[in-house]
Structures are given as structure tokens and as C-alpha cells.
Design a protein with these regions (language model features):
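Short, well-structured alpha-helical segments in soluble
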Residues: 74-90
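Extracytoplasmic ligand/sensor domains, especially the bilobed periplasmic-binding protein
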Residues: 91-122
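Bacterial N-terminal signal peptides
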Residues: 8-16
Length: 122
């Protein structure tokens, strides 16, 4: 498993554990902003597999993962993040590329667990 996949799994465990303590019976919705189409789709699909493995290890039927395709596009990433917010998601894993983080500052009510930094220049 690549280092980024291990980090994602760790973030899921930490997020799920903390949310589970706060709301034991309530459904926990975690968003996943990843490229599922386009040139980077292989990375996105690998992350989906890693997240599903982590959720299976947690073995909590209250955790729901909501996938959104960013297509590695900043505007589509923002639109997908807003959709997740409308669906009640408060914690989002992703986006995974720094160019997709630039517009997410306006979504103050959501926590983004991104493995990138918007200050990194390509």
C-alpha cells in the first residue's frame, strides 16, 4: 500500500473514531473528493479501495462514504464539495491535488482532510 493510501486510512480511522464518540447512534457521513474519471482516475479508484478497506476494518454500519468525482478540476471540486454539504457531510477526505483546493476556503462549515497544500506551486 502506498504511503498516501496509508495516510488516508489513518485519517479515516481518526475521523470515524472521533465522530463515533460524539454521535454513537447517528449516521456518520464522510465525503470523498477524488478523481474518478480522467487521467488521474487510477489514483482515485485506488483511494476508494483503501477507504472501503478501512471502513470494513472499523465495522460500523453507521459510517457512510459519499463519493464525488472531481475530475481533477477546481470548479468541479467546489461543486462536488457543495453537493456533499447539502447531503449533510461535515468531514471530507480530499481533494488529493493542490490545484483543486483553491476554492474550498469558502466552505467554512466543512472540514477537509486533504493530503496536499494549496500553497504548493506546480
Amino acid at each position: 500500500m502506498k504511503i498516501s493510501s496509508k495516510i488516508i486510512v489513518l485519517l479515516i480511522f481518526i475521523s470515524a473514531f472521533n465522530l463515533q464518540k460524539l454521535q454513537a447512534q447517528e449516521e456518520i457521513k464522510i465525503g470523498l473528493l477524488i478523481p474518478l474519471s480522467g487521467k488521474q482516475s487510477d489514483i482515485g479508484k485506488s483511494i476508494v479501495r483503501s477507504v472501503r478497506l478501512a471502513i470494513n476494518k472499523i465495522d460500523n454500519s453507521n459510517i457512510q462514504i459519499l463519493l464525488k468525482d472531481t475530475e481533477n478540476d477546481p470548479v468541479k471540486t467546489l461543486e462536488a464539495a457543495k453537493e456533499l454539504g447539502l447531503e449533510g457531510v461535515k468531514v471530507v477526505i480530499g481533494p488529493i491535488f493542490n490545484n483543486n483546493v483553491i476554492y474550498l476556503d469558502e466552505l467554512k462549515e466543512m472540514i477537509f482532510l486533504s493530503l496536499t497544500n494549496k500553497n504548493i506551486k506546480n
